[in-house]
Amino acid sequence: MQLKEFGVSLGDLIHEFNFEVVYGPEGFEKTEITKDDVNRPGLQLAGFFDYFDPNRIQIMGKVESSYVEGLSSEERRSRFDRLFETGIPVLLLSRNIDVFPECLAAAQEDGVPILRTNEFTSTIMSVIVAFLKVKLAPRVTLHGCLLYTSPSPRD
């Protein structure tokens, strides 16, 4: 019995949910998502990274955008630099949020794709998690052989 881990490519997610590509470095569609959960990076944009899992899809909604909007340009760049340096697979902007120039510059520097959707943050979070739970569910592959033998007649 062998348990195999699975991944979902960003290209598959873009196709499945019709995400807009705001920025995508060369070959980003092949990036594999291996975690079946997502994160809203509000605490990380405020500077708190304890227990942060950088392997999750990061979804930035209106709350995070409003917080970042109140920062100076230099501080915005610093916060996005710190987030992208962790190696997150993608930043997804919900509600058709405009990308901050500082966010785009930091993403380009670190090669982090930025996607966008018009869906509400909570809606797209739940839909993505449900999709990933199915696609990344553990599976077992068994190899077997069935052999039938008839009893030999005894005298």
Question: Residues of each region from the PLM?
Answer:
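Short internal beta-strands
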Residues: 91-94
